[in-house]
């Protein structure tokens, strides 16, 4: 599940997306559309009836998990931002060691333990819980997810780096400064 924005130009630049061999979606939001979602199977883009800005991210992610659950009912989901470069072989190799319901790069804020938003993993059990997430808890999507999943089995797993020099050894590189996009 790749979180993007309907005006984003980054998706076309992410070559790793073309190598995905399992069902995936690219999430966009449009609060003005009538339908709860519009899904284009060819492009994998699902446009959800929700805000498409930073403050609306908790609602967008909740709606995204609901769509993915109803459409695909997957065993797990990796939530990935559109400013990530991902080594898919390494990412899927981690599944062998992820014996948890929620995993990612650990953060702590406002008394909430959560995994940073650019890339995290949730199990089937967690997907079911996230469909009913309280979106009013925080404007930050990753904090809202962490609060919602506070009673699940968690595992710190450093999926990504923000340091380009570690990019060849890491599972993913977070281009948060948009140097390469």
Where is each model-derived feature located?
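Short, acidic, metal-binding catalytic loop of nucleotide-sugar glycosyltransferases
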Residues: 12-24
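Conserved donor-nucleotide/metal-binding helix-loop-beta segment in metal-dependent transferases, i.e.
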Residues: 86-111
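Active-site-proximal specificity loops/subdomain of glycosyltransferases
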Residues: 25-75, 85-89
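C-terminal catalytic/acceptor-binding lobe
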Residues: 124, 136-181
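N-proximal low-complexity "stem/linker" segments adjacent to membrane-targeting elements
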Residues: 1-11
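A recurrent flexible, glycine/aromatic-enriched loop bordering the glycosyltransferase active site
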Residues: 107-121, 135-138
